[in-house]
Amino acid sequence: MYQLRKFDFFEEKYGGKIPEDVTGDIQCCSSGRGKVVIGSNDGSVSFLDRGVKFDSGFQAHSSSVLFLQHLKQRNFLVTVGEDEQISPQQSGMCLKVFDLDKVQEEGTSSSAPECIGILRIFTNQFPEAKITSFLVLEEVPPILLIAIGLDNGCIYCVKGDIARERITRFKLQVDGRSAITGLGFRMDGQALLLFAVTPESVNLFSMQAQPPKLQTLDHIGGSVNTVTMSDRSELIVGRPEAVYFYEVDGRGPCWAFEGEKKFMGWFRGYLLCVIDDSKTGNTVFNVYDLRNRLIAYSIVVDKVSNMLCEWGNIILIKADKSLLCITEKDMESKLDMLFKKNLYTVAINLVQSQHADAAATANVMRKYGDHLYGKQDFDEAMLQYINTIGYLEPSFVIQKFLDAQRIYNLTNYLEKLHEKGLASKDHTTLLLNCYTKLKDVEKLNTFIRKEDGIGELKFDVETAIRVCRAANYHEHAMYVAKKAGKHEWYLKILLEDLGNYDEALQYVSSLEPSQAGVTIEQYGKILIEHKPKETIDILMRLCTEQGIPNGVFLSMLPSPVDFITVFVQHPHSLMHFLERYAEIVQDSPAQAEINNTLLELYLSRDLNFPSISLSENGLDKDLIDHSVAAAVSKADPEKKTNADSKDAMEKDCTERQQKGLELLKMAWPSDLEQPLYDVDLAVILCEMNSFKDGLLYLYEKMKFYKEVIACYMQNHDHEGLIACCKRLGDSSKGGDPSLWADLLKYFGEIGEDCTKEVKEVLTYIERDDILPPIIVLQTLAKNPCLTLSVIKDYIARKLEQESKIIEEDRRAVEKYQETTKNMRKEIEDLRTNARIFQLSKCTACTFTLDIPAVHFMCMHSFHQRCLGDNEKECPECAPEYRSVMEMKRSLEQNSKDQDLFFQQVKGSKDGFSVIAEYFGKGIISKTRDATS
């Protein structure tokens, strides 16, 4: 016999007498739809509500109600009872179906549900016998399957729509000697099965077969009211020695609960038993929790006549017409009861069996773990805490086991956290620290490599790398970094911890170009310092599509400018890299930036890192300054004082400057208006490094001729200065003649004897008539070292030339005065004297002139018919007159074009002559009214 623990998981809700409105002795009970239905021996049926108060009642049968069942799908009540006999040969036992939703009046003060079907149970084909059991199965509405068990071992079955009398009746034979004490329907897939219990056997009918097939499951049966069905459709039979469960294939488990079973039932997974205890002579009502092997409730009761369940309660109806309602306590109350007794395993089983939510289960396990932890049973406590993962804050558990120095248990917990994917970075750090502290390399290997080939690692990668690296487990850290694609970490360990530069270069070469570029930007400084040639080879492959390992070529290659900062302490390597790149790639989008950087490298005297050009390219100025300072601080001081080194540096500087000049020329071909470098930057670099050749080339290309001669002036290179002016001062070749004036001014202010140079300059000034003699005199007079003999011949020639011009102008003036005088005389004559027209022929047609004729003051005469409509002007003189007027209008129009005027003044050798011409033609001689 099982010795089960007893608990009070249920409690009495209320009890009392059944209302007096329920008349007669109670024969049968049923429940459903919030009501308890009672059938009495006087044929009445009564309904009780939730408060066990009388709700309604009606007379179902004239004599007695033996069985009844309240259906679930439809609000029907099926009863079996005795009615009046129609004849002595015909039994009065009837089956009735009542529709409880349809009420009809019975007299003036009562009403009853409508009886929609009446069936005589016993007929000639179905002989009368005592009814011992009754069960109704609701199939697809309106079909009912009713089984009626008899004391002769027969089962009468009725199937169909009783209300419409569309039914089929058949009988099943179990045993001719034993009564049918219990029935139970079960659906097994699509097959309908019927359990039938007698005192001597347990049987099963397959209702799908025709006729139904009988199978005997056991040769020991049960008595009336000791048969029930579980919620899993298992048949339960109670016998004095035990309770047996049956499946479709035979007897299942049994429970040795001794005592004669009076009533059996099933409620929410609990087995309900009313047992006569022979030892004490009491009748006991027990509620069994079979899954958790405990008695959930036990109470001594008086004689029970019926047992049913409704409203979430268990209802016991006693023989004295009193009842007892028993209800289940809430989960919290039950758990508190178990916690007080330290029955944590029972509590866990309880919440799991009743399908409580996972959080509630985890809470119970936490309390159990706390209990075990308090008893210092750390291993078992940790097992419970592991089951709370996902619901209990991990820090609660971790803190406990950190304090207790239980590193093995803590390691186990952290491993489970990672398995479930709930570990944070801190958890990963702690677990790896546990492994390293325990020096458990095997577990560390398992943790690191268990995901090998499966997919993403289920822990924080960077945290794992940091911890392994700090504990000198470099191989593990590198494995994680490589598996997770953390190339920067992999290289960091190789370079900073292991100093394995060859493997680092090999690893970078194996990466995709985009990834390799990123890693080179981060760790290129170290690689350049130790493996410059190999690193430059990798950079060349990245930037020029040469030999990419996996054969994948990028549509957008990285620019060499992106990698310049990795050479911050190695300008020689940078120069070598950019030269190699420029040889291969001629049309790079970053060609200007590359040339700028190369120019700074070529032109700097000490070959420093190109900070100016990089700032122009938009790189971080603070980073550049810091890197340059670091590079300077690392410079070898002996190299600055060693004479041989100085000679070598001077030679190197000369060679680089020559390269710089070649680059200046090559990157500014004649067909380009702007060069492939920053001109302003190039000028600054040449100025800073005193690179005269480059500066002269740039100024000349930019047509800054005055700056060109300024360079010669600064160096007092008189020969080169004059040669430069000869080349750049010829206006016929696009030069600037004013350079000679600047040159003359220079010699006038130099304070040295430069007679030879001045004479040569005066030759070109005189040839191109660049300056007036007075300006030449004033300019050269400032040099005290020059004598008048320098300009004697020049002045004589200019005076002679000016004298000739003055004489020519005097004669022209006299001529114009004579012409003007004659014109004024003619005008006066026209005003004061008459004109005699003596022409005898028409000027137009040359025929004899006759009247009407037209005479003009110009002494031309015409037939009037030859003039036509034009009688106001002479056809012979009009073209010349119009030409003069058109010229006048053009001059007036030109007077408004100021740009043209200044352009002519600027382009002329003698600007004053242009102004005089404008005045002479009367273009700008008229003063306009400012208000007009």
From Swiss-Prot:
Zinc finger extent (RING-type): 842-877
UniProt keyword terms in alphabetical order: Coiled coil, Membrane, Metal-binding, Repeat, Vacuole, Zinc, Zinc-finger
One cellular-component annotation, GO: protein-containing complex
Keyword Cell inner membrane set for record: no
UniProt note on tissues of expression: Expressed in roots, leaves, stems, siliques and flowers.
Pfam families: TPR_PEP5_VPS11, VPS11_C, VPS11_N, zf-C3H2C3
Coiled coil regions, renumbered to chain: 795-841
Keyword ATP-binding: no
Placement of CHCR repeats on the sequence: 385-536, 548-756
InterPro entries with a match to the protein in the record: ARM-type_fold, Clathrin_H-chain/VPS_repeat, TPR-like_helical_dom_sf, VPS11, VPS11_C, WD40/YVTN_repeat-like_dom_sf, WD40_repeat_dom_sf, Znf_RING
GO BP terms: intracellular protein transport; vacuole organization; vesicle-mediated transport
UniProt topology in membrane: Peripheral membrane protein
Compartments it resides in: Vacuole membrane; Prevacuolar compartment membrane
One MF term in the entry's GO annotations: zinc ion binding
Record note on quaternary structure: Core component of at least two putative endosomal tethering complexes, the homotypic fusion and vacuole protein sorting (HOPS) complex and the class C core vacuole/endosome tethering (CORVET) complex. Their common core is composed of the class C Vps proteins VPS11, VCL1, VPS18 and VPS33, which in HOPS further associates with VPS39 and VPS41 and in CORVET with VPS3. Interacts directly with VPS39 and VPS3.
UniProt function note: Involved in regulating membrane fusion at the tonoplast and the prevacuolar compartment.
Family of the protein in this entry: Belongs to the VPS11 family.
This protein's name: Vacuolar protein-sorting-associated protein 11 homolog
Taxonomic source organism: Arabidopsis thaliana
